[in-house]
């Protein structure tokens, strides 16, 4: 219904349940819902969560995480770990929200035909 109203982006936050008991597994396992996803962020508390979360998403659900955020990226050591262990960017949403938003915007522009072409860019408007 939202797509028919011209919504460009829907952000779906699933909480801490990729391995928990919150019903997130059913959402991630649904091929129709998964196909709608154009960018996947993993929020991780620590290096173990980074490594395990990226592997779980790929091996169990066939989802390639695009960027890691969360407390694991609170410092340079964590950001370097993310890059070294996963090959993914680690971008802290609290300390670098603009960089994270720009990264996601670039991913969507690459993956969604016409994304952003008819809308003003709020990030550029702030400059």
Model-derived features with residue positions:
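C-terminal helix of von Willebrand factor
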Residues: 96-119
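Short acidic/histidine-rich motifs immediately flanking catalytic phosphotransfer sites
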Residues: 6
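Long, low-complexity, intrinsically disordered segments
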Residues: 118-127
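Conserved catalytic-core segment of NTP-binding enzymes
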Residues: 1, 9, 14-102
